């Protein structure tokens, strides 16, 4: 995911009251991979983007998900897999240039 060039789509991501526009190079890659790419970008520049730790202070795993408002204004989590168990992508959810997605943090208690 880079902010240079014209490949892919530019999406506005928000997390903890900070919004950052990022270019998703391949909107057909899995949502899981997209989240991994966001985390990688955040690790490279946490001051400019976000701090997205893998563990909390109590050594509990932190998972991240993507969400948005659906056409009716309700919150929707973009699931990594569909009912058939196939990986989903931003393309599968119809995410397009300029859309706004929210990064959702969930602590998994150990």
Language model regions located:
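Ubiquitin system architectures
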Residues: 1-110
